[in-house]
């Protein structure tokens, strides 16, 4: 079926390529004209294009001239003129497609064409890369083109302060990684004031290495979490000791394909004896089962120096797709703590989800999505089905000259690595540069040790040496160079024969203290000479390496995905250069061991078969392709499943985040809050009058419940008297009388606080209640999803059940937000500010508002003041002056007898899993940013009560309200 769908999707290739060829002809027609422009005239074209767009012209109408302008700017600033195939790629990106451009074809430069064109609208363009290094590098290099044309660039990096991020997002073109952009979106929807927002919308995005980001990394959602309550850390160390006492096969089973474990009866008995309990599966002991399973998984499924490394007493995850350390990210659901216990390092606390989104749904937020990669056609069906974007294969500028040799399979790993070392020694002696790809830090260091014994000088590029990545990659194509690398060298790196002139020029200018952002004029002036010097130094060596056969890529193990193998191969043979590639495999490799059918083992299983004799046959090649196909099919199902379930939460998230943004941006909530009050009161009345005759209604109980919502001033007797007698009381009459009283109570509350303070109090209360209820809802949805699979045993579709019950939970949450927000508005105690102090503290006309309000559970109820970067003037508010928290508390809120805990200063950021699974994800502890920790508010002496009555009376009303809700 997929092959048929692929054929259908490829039927339109000829048509789109014909259209792109026509666009190239139009761009070329303008080239001579723009080449005659002076630098100033070329810069003025940007203003001309913006004016034409303002007059109603479309982006498509100005595309040929805009592309020609960028092409000329790139020629003048970088010394590089985009080829026709790069213009085709840029046009494909602008049209909202994925451009498949082979390695070395200049994807980064091609992206400048649509980025410039779409930035002219003023709505911003995001360019997404796979890591911080590439984001910074591309921003610095391509930013020279944009700045030449009068546009601004930004770069989002981990560790930046909120004000830095806001400034970079405000630029015309912003570079960053998928995780950083996704987390900023989630953080914006956790902000407590409009001043904390950093992003400005999602207009157009270009995703570099799009298959890695939207396919490989899409199996696990982005999650922001905070410390959970309780201390379960003691059990992790205890169960790490238990796991060491258990034996594989006899005490437990391991399914490495599905990455699951199962404890057998003998193992259960050992655990019960060790813990001194009678039954591990009693309800009281049920939580211990999770600790046991995680301890066994940590022991069997997570390998040190492959899945993670231990540096400075900390467990750091290694990304299987890139080989890079995922700085500070952590596995969720207790998995990271189990690994920490296994390694004997400090165990950090567990976390609770605060915000989450999948990469699929994040990138669906953009008005237009485009991407580029060297390997996309194999996933064309998934790109079309999930993201509604097509894949366009762009022709190469020069014919491919790389020779891909057949795989060699050895009996065991020792024989394989001996042959690998022998091959490297031979190539190195001839002077041919060699790039060796490994699948883990452990294997790269093993091979490095063997090469040292042979006296072969080499560089190692893995997660432990990631800081030297740029310099290592820049030199990997030089004569005699030997580079041993994990997947880090597979994407986003351009290995040029003889050396990378651009990298050398950048390094030279950096040594001179020149920076493209800090000293742009000096940098531009020095660039031509630096580039010319670097180009001259590598030109002669380039020709020499070409004569030696180009770069030799040697893979030591097949990856789960064919695309990752192709990415490694693609480092060689760029722009028509010669090259060579070959994979060395063994029957002990993970892919062969887990998915091989056993045919190759029967050939090589004989004890007489030499360890150093390779097997080369079509049968093995087909077996490898079959194994990779199984893994890719499994991962595709995981991604589809993740998306189906997240689509349920995505619709709910869109509603909540839209409501939240309106509150943050200063919308007048008076009408909405009065609507809340009407809905809550009506629901209480309907619950009390839905059964029985009027004389049997318990009006006293209804009144007790209503007093927990607002200070009701009429009595049941007055309502009965108004009707004549109890039998003549109707639900409509009750609703009319009580709603009228509630409206008067709202007006009295507003008059007491003043309209300005009332509006700000409404904003803070609604925002805080919404946040807390949304967090609780995420927890409930997680809990629901964990057990929903069991519904299949009752012949019910788990997804349908999840959708149905998820909607019920969402509806209940919306009702709870209304009820709790109204209750807080009437019952919070507010200290009135002294007029003199108010005038002193608030000089910009902004109302002075209460400090952080809190609820009965101690949760913060309000955002902090708007963050203004140091040294900058305060930004004017859009609709009316923004409320500020006074330096000396002008108003405080009664926390109903409980202390207010500080808002967590350290959050966890969970991103795509390093092992590609969907049952857990990683998180990251980050610095405490400005505006993230809440203060403690205590009741002040002399505070006036907004809701009447003391704390004890309020508590009684709340208990009565809860009882009424249960009956409802």
UniProtKB/Swiss-Prot annotation:
Biased amino acid composition, Basic residues: 956-968
Xref: Pfam families: P-loop_SecA, SecA_DEAD, SecA_PP_bind, SecA_SW
Keyword flag Translocase: yes
Membrane topology note: Peripheral membrane protein
InterPro entries: Helicase_ATP-bd, Helicase_C-like, P-loop_NTPase, SecA, SecA_CS, SecA_DEAD, SecA_motor_DEAD, SecA_preprotein_X-link_dom
Predominant cellular place of this UniProt entry's protein: membrane
Subunit structure as annotated in this protein's UniProt entry: Monomer and homodimer. Part of the essential Sec protein translocation apparatus which comprises SecA, SecYEG and auxiliary proteins SecDF. Other proteins may also be involved.
Similarity comment: Belongs to the SecA family.
Record protein name field: Protein translocase subunit SecA
Organism of origin: Beutenbergia cavernae (strain ATCC BAA-8 / DSM 12333 / CCUG 43141 / JCM 11478 / NBRC 16432 / NCIMB 13614 / HKI 0122)
Gene name as annotated: secA
């Amino acid at each position: 079926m997929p092959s048929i769908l692929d054929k259908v999707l490829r039927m339109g290739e000829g048509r789109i390529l014909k259209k792109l060829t026509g666009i190239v002809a139009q761009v070329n027609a303008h080239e001579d004209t723009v080449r005659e422009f002076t630098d100033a005239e070329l810069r003025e074209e940007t203003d001309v294009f913006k004016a034409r767009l303002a007059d109603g012209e479309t982006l498509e109408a100005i595309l040929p001239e805009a592309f020609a302008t960028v092409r000329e700017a790139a020629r003048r600033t970088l010394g590089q003129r985009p080829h026709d195939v790069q213009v085709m790629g840029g046009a494909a990106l602008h049209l909202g497609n994925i451009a498949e451009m082979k390695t070395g074809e200049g994807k980064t430069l091609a992206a400048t064409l649509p980025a410039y064109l779409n930035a002219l609208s003023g709505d911003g363009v995001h360019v997404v890369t796979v890591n911080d290094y590439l984001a910074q590098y591309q921003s610095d290099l391509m930013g020279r083109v944009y700045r030449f044309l009068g546009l601004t660039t930004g770069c989002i990096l981990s560790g930046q302060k909120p004000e830095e991020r806001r400034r970079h997002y405000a630029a015309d073109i912003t570079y960053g990684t998928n995780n950083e952009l996704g987390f900023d979106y989630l953080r914006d929807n956790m902000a407590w004031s409009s001043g904390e927002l950093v992003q400005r919308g999602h207009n157009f995005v270009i995703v570099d290495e799009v298959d890695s980001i939207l396919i490989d990394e899409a199996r696990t959602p982005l999650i922001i979490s905070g410390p959970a309550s309780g201390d379960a850390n003691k059990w992790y160390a205890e169960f790490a000791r238990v796991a060491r006492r258990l034996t594989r096969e006899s005490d437990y089973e391991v399914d490495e394909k599905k990455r699951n474990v199962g404890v057998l009866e003998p193992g259960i008995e050992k655990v019960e004896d060790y813990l001194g309990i009678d039954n591990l599966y009693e309800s009281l002991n049920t939580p211990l089962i999770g600790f046991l399973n995680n301890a066994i998984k940590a022991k069997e499924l997570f390998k040190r120096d492959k899945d993670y490394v231990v540096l400075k007493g900390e467990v750091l995850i290694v990304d299987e797709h890139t080989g890079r350390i995922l700085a500070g990210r952590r596995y969720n659901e207790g998995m990271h703590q189990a690994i920490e216990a296994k390694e004997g390092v400090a165990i950090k606390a567990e976390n609770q989800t605060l915000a989450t989104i999948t990469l699929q749904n994040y990138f669906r937020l953009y008005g237009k999505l485009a991407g580029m990669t060297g390997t996309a056609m194999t996933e064309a069906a998934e790109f079309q089905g999930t993201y509604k974007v097509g894949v366009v294969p762009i022709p190469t500028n020069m014919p491919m000259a790389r020779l891909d040799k057949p795989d060699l399979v050895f009996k065991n790993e020792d024989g394989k690595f001996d042959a690998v070392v022998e091959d490297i020694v031979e190539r190195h002696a001839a002077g041919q540069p060699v790039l060796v790809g490994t699948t883990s830090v452990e294997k790269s260091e093993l091979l490095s040790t063997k090469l040292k014994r042979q006296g072969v000088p080499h560089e190692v590029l893995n997660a432990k040496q990631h800081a030297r990545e740029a310099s290592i990659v820049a030199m990997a194509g030089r004569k005699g160079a030997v580079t041993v690398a994990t997947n880090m060298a597979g994407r986003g790196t351009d290995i040029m024969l003889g050396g990378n002139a651009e990298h050398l020029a950048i390094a030279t200018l950096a040594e001179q203290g020149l920076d493209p952002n800090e000293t742009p004029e000096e940098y531009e002036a020095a660039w031509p000479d630096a580039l010319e010097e670097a180009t001259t130094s590598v030109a002669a060596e380039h020709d020499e390496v070409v004569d030696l056969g180009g770069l030799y890529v040697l893979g030591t193990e097949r990856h789960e995905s064919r695309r990752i193998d192709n990415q490694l191969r693609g480092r060689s043979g760029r722009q028509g250069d010669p090259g060579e590639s070959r994979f060395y495999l063994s029957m002990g490799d993970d892919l062969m061991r887990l998915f091989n059918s056993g045919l190759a083992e029967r050939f090589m299983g004989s004890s007489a078969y030499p360890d150093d004799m390779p097997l080369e046959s079509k049968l093995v090649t087909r077996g490898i392709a079959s194994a990779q196909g199984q893994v890719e099919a499994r991962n595709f199902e995981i991604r589809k499943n993740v998306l189906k379930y997240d689509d349920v939460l995505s619709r709910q998230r869109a509603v909540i985040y839209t409501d939240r943004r309106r509150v943050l941006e200063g919308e007048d909530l008076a009408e909405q809050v009065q609507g809340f009050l009407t809905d809550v009161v009506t629901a209480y009345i309907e619950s009390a009058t839905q059964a029985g005759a009027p004389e049997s209604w318990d009006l006293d109980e209804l009144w007790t419940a209503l007093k927990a919502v607002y200070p009701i001033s009429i009595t049941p007797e007055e309502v009965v008297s108004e009707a004549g007698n109890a039998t003549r009381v109707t639900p409509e009459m009750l609703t009319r009388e009580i709603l009228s009283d509630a409206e008067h109570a709202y007006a009295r509350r507003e008059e007491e606080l003043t309209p300005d303070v009332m509006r700000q109090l409404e904003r803070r209360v609604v925002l805080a209640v919404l946040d807390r209820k949304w967090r609780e809802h995420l927890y409930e949805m997680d809990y629901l999803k964990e057990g929903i699979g069991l519904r299949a045993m009752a012949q019910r579709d788990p997804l349908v059940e999840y959708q149905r019950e998820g909607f019920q939970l969402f509806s209940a949450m919306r009702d709870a937000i209304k009820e709790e927000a109204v209750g807080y508005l009437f019952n919070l105690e507010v200290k009135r500010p002294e007029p003199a102090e108010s005038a002193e503290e608030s000089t910009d006309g902004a109302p002075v508002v209460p400090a952080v309000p809190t609820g009965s559970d101690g949760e913060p109820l309000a955002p902090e003041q708007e963050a203004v970067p140091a040294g900058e003037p305060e930004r004017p508010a859009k609709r009316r002056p923004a409320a500020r928290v006074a330096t000396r508390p002008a108003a405080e809120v009664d926390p109903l007898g409980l202390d207010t805990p500080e808002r967590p200063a350290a959050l966890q950021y969970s991103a795509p899993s390093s092992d590609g699974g969907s049952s857990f994800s990683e998180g990251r502890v980050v610095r405490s940013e400005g505006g993230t920790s809440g203060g403690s508010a205590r009741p002040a002496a002399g505070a006036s009560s907004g809701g009447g009555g003391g704390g004890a009376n309020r508590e009684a009303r709340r208990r009565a309200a809860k009882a009424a809700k249960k009956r409802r």
